[in-house]
Amino acid sequence: MAISTPMLVTFCVYIFGMILIGFIAWRSTKNFDDYILGGRSLGPFVTALSAGASDMSGWLLMGLPGAVFLSGISESWIAIGLTLGAWINWKLVAGRLRVHTEYNNNALTLPDYFTGRFEDKSRILRIISALVILLFFTIYCASGIVAGARLFESTFGMSYETALWAGAAATILYTFIGGFLAVSWTDTVQASLMIFALILTPVIVIISVGGFGDSLEVIKQKSIENVDMLKGLNFVAIISLMGWGLGYFGQPHILARFMAADSHHSIVHARRISMTWMILCLAGAVAVGFFGIAYFNEHPAVAGAVNQNAERVFIELAQILFNPWIAGILLSAILAAVMSTLSCQLLVCSSAITEDLYKAFLRKQASQKELVWVGRVMVLVVALVAIALAANPENRVLGLVSYAWAGFGAAFGPVVLFSVMWSRMTRNGALAGMIIGALTVIVWKQFGWLGLYEIIPGFIFGSIGIVVFSLLGKAPSAAMQKRFADADAHYHSAPPSRLQEG
């Protein structure tokens, strides 16, 4: 469908607004701490929505609705698993990680935190974790660029190659300029846009088909299996879909939001906001795909694009059902989802190179200004590599994301979880858990044993590795155990009263 002038104007205004926020954030970025973690100044609202937006990539508006459109409501198991995993992550990890990173050399990155938490003088933990971030996040960034390119290709009628660069340019620019504050502030705007799109679209789809009851009847008539939660699924398949929730414990771009909160006490409010946002967005995404079945069954003349590529179901519904101004806003939500996640991932990759490799091994005495500019250059370098990986237009967003999600979940998830919950954990345990988790994902992905999603064996074997190697070796030093105890006591301390705050 050809792009209209109102849609073009809406897109341009949106993109310009994101870049403007980047320039505003640039004025608040005074040092590398500001560029990477925003000076740990995020309040609960920004923490919540930026964590949500950075988590839900283009997959939320393309991959998930497309999967439900193809297979029916049974694909919603993945949304249930994600919701449970996110809630547990907020409950167990978020506040603790905020405190423990501060107690361990005021760590700015996960590799930096692991090095301080386990007194790793060899710095092998820093190297391995930084390399794991670069490997899996480059794949993750590529998936975001593919999603953005598809949007530009479909909406503007561009060639895929042109769309590839157009879709990534604005994100790279505001991330390059403004760093973490730009990313977090734009994430908040983008999260608001995403929830608006995912609530409005399924409501209009249902109305256009004749109401909820009529829509459900049409879906059942096409195939009764569309409303069967267990359609074609055995125990392994359900566990694999639910297993996506395990990934939350190890996603650096989400964990960075916890680390950047202004206080661990504000995490409680952030959790409530974030989980409400997440449940509404996931329900909306499932509803788009589910009721999209009814709409395109009733209107087969316009179903050609979604029958060719189910991931376009949201795009097609937005363009068909809404006037061009509203359609432009709704399609901007896909760009918002892509940009919010891509910008966070670019920044995490940049920080891994700058803080954990460049500063740690090449320029220990580098000035803050130098580190900020190295960080900016690394944003460009990682983006170019990701664009090269995304050059094949046949890539499937869900497939790429599932691999990267599993990689982080298994390599970092058990290490992060045990590091904030178990004082007996050692450097060797962390190293074993990281290596075993990552290797299990890579090997399991290649062989596809039992049809089980690779994050599950990766998480299990990684956790076992942590416990076994921690107990086999020497106990943590007295200083390490005291630091853990102090951080844990701080985490459990009561929040200041209003009188104390005032």
Regions found by a protein language model. Name each.
Residues M1-G502:
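Membrane-embedded helix-loop-helix hairpins and adjacent transmembrane boundary segments
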